[in-house]
Swiss-Prot record:
This is Probable porphobilinogen deaminase. GO terms for biological process: heme biosynthetic process; protoporphyrinogen IX biosynthetic process. One of its GO terms (molecular function) is hydroxymethylbilane synthase activity. Belongs to the HMBS family. GO terms for cellular component: cytoplasm. Its EC number is 2.5.1.61. Signal peptide: none annotated. Its cofactor is dipyrromethane. Tetrapolymerization of the monopyrrole PBG into the hydroxymethylbilane pre-uroporphyrinogen in several discrete steps. The modification S-(dipyrrolylmethanemethyl)cysteine is found at residue 234. InterPro entries: HemC, Porphobilin_deaminase_cofac_BS, Porphobilin_deaminase_N, Porphobilinogen_deaminase_C, Porphobilinogen_deaminase_C_sf. Binds 1 dipyrromethane group covalently. It catalyses: 4 porphobilinogen + H2O = hydroxymethylbilane + 4 NH4(+).
Length: 317
């Protein structure tokens, strides 16, 4: 079976892990690297690449539908909530750490950073959350693979950088930093989760389905349902995080939508029963819309569109 993947270090690490897991189950694979729009245009903010939605996914979907690959491995947070027919998400791997991490050259924490310190991030969500938590800090765009981002931090281009902790874990790197609490920095929906998508083929689906981790699938589906009516995908300032309680009877849900400048937000923080959790998540998603979440998401998309056209430059992404 042919596994398609992006060519970045992180994407290859994720794909090689899936290939290893399949080999343990007697499935032989080969890897085919596909260049995506998100990889080609690293000189511009991610939200400016094809609207940001599906920038790392769309080309892999296309080559799979064309029959050139059998399997695709994705960081699940990059996958739009609306997916093409005929490309089932057959496996959701066990989730890695879902939270953001702040790395600084000397170990300074977020609360200890001086005023006007420069924070690098490629995420509008993290930018908005930083602006809400520490409006005295400066946020600047940071693209590139993990190596590039760490090099820029070491060179002093930034006082700190924000990353997904899971990316460091998948690379096998142990780097000290400050794990940011989801109470203040609610992560992107499905952050820390790898999804395995296949062609709609019973033989391929059967080979891959054994990799599925039930608990991770449940919470990631909850997170996607929560934000499904908001629009904007992984590029807008939207956070959604669900975790099972220790007794597996309830799901703790956090979700939020922010304005780009971090001055306005709507938030949900509730426990819902495991039984009937999907329907309850839909109800909470509707409530998030009614509270003004959809308005904030639409305003963010409009502002992003204006910036991409060069009509406004009020946000230093």
């Amino acid at each position: 079976m042919i596994i398609g993947t992006r060519g970045s270090q992180l994407a290859l690490a994720q794909t090689e892990n899936v290939a290893r897991l399949l080999k343990e189950r007697g499935v032989e694979t080969s890897i085919k690297i596909i260049k995506t729009s998100g990889d080609r245009f690293t000189d511009r903010p991610l939200h400016a690449v094809s609207g940001g939605v599906g920038a790392f996914v769309r080309e892999l979907d296309d080559v799979m539908l064309a029959g050139e690959i059998d399997i695709a491995v994705h960081s699940m947070k990059d996958m739009p909530t609306i997916r093409p027919e005929g490309l089932p998400t057959v496996a959701v791997l066990k989730r890695d750490t879902p939270f953001d991490i702040l790395l600084t050259y000397d170990g300074t924490t977020l609360d200890e950073l001086p005023e006007q310190a420069i924070i690098g991030t490629s995420s509008l969500r993290r930018t908005a959350q930083i602006r809400r938590y520490r409006p005295d800090l400066i946020t600047q765009e940071l693209r590139g693979n993990i190596d590039t981002r760490l090099r820029k931090l070491k060179e002093g281009q930034y006082d700190g950088i924000l990353l997904a902790k899971a990316g460091l874990e998948r690379m096998g790197w142990e780097i000290d930093g400050e794990i940011l609490s989801p109470d203040f920095f609610c992560p992107s929906p499905n952050q820390g989760t790898v999804a395995v998508v296949t062609r709609a083929d019973p033989e391929i689906e059967a080979a891959v389905s054994g990799l599925d981790h039930t608990e991770s699938r449940i919470v990631t589906e909850i997170e996607r349902i929560l934000i499904s009516e908001l629009g904007g995908g992984c590029t807008t300032p939207i956070g959604s995080y669900a975790e099972l309680t220790s007794d597996k009877q309830e799901i703790h849900i956090r979700a939020e939508v922010l304005s780009l400048d971090g001055k306005e937000d709507v938030r949900i923080d509730e426990f819902i029963p495991m039984l009937g959790g999907l329907e309850k998540a839909r109800e909470l998603g509707h409530r998030l819309v009614e509270m003004g979440g959809k308005r904030l998401a639409e305003e963010a998309l409009l502002q992003i569109s204006r910036n991409a056209c060069g009509t406004e430059n009020s946000f230093d992404y």
